[in-house]
Amino acid sequence: MKAICRLTLMTIMALVPKAMNADLSSDSLAYHDASTLPLLGTLAPDASNAYTRLPDSLKANMRPELWALGQNSAGLAVRFRSDASTIGAAWYSRNKFDMNHMTATGIRGLDLYVLDNNGHWTTMGSARPNFFRHNTRTIVMTDMEPKMREYMLYLSLYDGVDSLYIGTNEGALVLAPEAATPRRANPVIMYGTSILQGGCATRPGMCHTNIIERMIDYEVINLGFSGNAKLDLDIARLIASTPNPSVIVLDPLPNLKTPELVERMPEFYSIIRKAHPTTPILFVESPIFPLMRFNTETYDTITEKNAALRQLVNGFIAAGDKNIEYFEGKNVLGDDPETTVDNYHLTDLGFVGFAQRLAPVIQRLIKQ
């Protein structure tokens, strides 16, 4: 968990982010500025950078590491419809970041989904990033019947997007969506670590927050911060200021030591609960990682943290909170040892299993 954070921050802090434009030159596609289209997954619709997760007002006082990670576009998705027969994208990756245990497509690629005739989102294809440059222009699908379709384009998980254009064949339309899916009025907010940010999905659509979004048909706000889910009160206040969330999921344990959890969680929770007195809050234990079968120190550390969270939550319930749900760590990955890349960060298999177990709980809380 520490390695992914260290690599991320070394890269982000070494580069001064500048608003750069995608390269649209000498290409057979016509390009449409995606900033004019609805953007899902952001709590900063009026930010100076269109594709950020955090409002500008937080920058001055927020920890620099946390702010930098907030410029990663995890969980962001552009919604549109088009009658294109060929569709692609052009975008500028803010940092051109790479890691040795996660694909470039997951880190800084894009992932295109289409709404099928049954109203389900299905993958169409990934936009793989240029290995050598910040700029990428690529075609995702060609030779389609030119009819109107609804699309959702997931953005990069571990890099930022400075500019983005939808590419189509000449004469094709790119318009705002007609289908109201996913539902946006009452988003699900999920806060957590590098796992929640999407480490190490092979492509953006395979992060469990994005899978859950498609499964439950509700917008999901991804507040995953690699190595930095430290229960910063700035994040608690941001969640508190979000109108009408349907469910709030708190999943920060892998980034916390037990004393930090015990000291910080009560105030973090109380800020959110004061603003949203009846919104269901779902507390998620640390996963029971595969290496815990062998590494006794890790087993003891995680078991202690999970027990501390259970005690805190029991206290909140005893104080009268009837809108709390608890998700045990053994249910995150189940019994399958093939669910991680490095004993911590999830494979696509791990993300699918996690989503399949967590989504029904969230859906029940929404209906409740």
Short names for language-model regions:
Residues 289-327, 353:
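Substrate-gating cap/lid alpha-helix
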Residues 99-102, 198-206, 299-303:
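Glycine- and acidic-residue-enriched helix-capping/strand-helix junction motifs
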Residues 4, 14, 19-187, 366-367:
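N-terminal secretory targeting modules
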Residues 185-209:
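Catalytic nucleophile-elbow at a beta strand-turn-alpha helix junction centered on a G-D-S/GDSL motif
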Residues 342-368:
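Histidine-centered active-site loop/cap adjacent to the catalytic His
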Residues 2-10:
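Sec-dependent signal peptide recognition
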Residues 200, 204, 212, 230-275, ...:
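Oxyanion-hole/transition-state-stabilizing segment in secreted/luminal serine hydrolases
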Residues 209-222, 314:
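Short helix-loop-beta junction
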